[in-house]
Amino acid sequence: MNSHHVIPVTAPGIALRGYGAIEETDLHDFHQIVLGLDGEMVMTVDGVGERIDQGSAWLIPAGARHDYAGIGENRQLVLDLPAAALAVPERLFNTARAVRIDPALTKLVRKIAQRAALAAPPS
């Protein structure tokens, strides 16, 4: 199991992430949205697998096991959302699912990613 989140998520968070070719597994008590930016990754949530690229995303409910691996160079915008957050519609996370992203929304995701990159501490 991956331990990206040892500390409980009590407020929404945003991060830019890239994933390696070796498959990892995660399970946590908060909702997550993984939006493709560059390259591709493969993700399986509750037994359903899909590729994520710049035109797609995964909606992952709290408590859903997900297995994932990057395909070559890749980068995703990851939103971590507390399961009890009032601002998150409960029906959005009734079930895990991959979704296609509208091209206009893809542009917005890129702008958010650029701002997140500027705000991130140097690694």
Language model segments and positions:
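A cytosolic small-molecule/anion-sensing beta-strand core signal
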Residues: 37-38, 53-54, 72
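Short acidic-glycine-tyrosine-enriched beta hairpin
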Residues: 47-63
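Ligand-binding loop in jelly-roll beta-barrel domains
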Residues: 63-86
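Amphipathic alpha-helical segments enriched in hydrophobic/aromatic residues interleaved with Lys/Arg
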Residues: 86-123
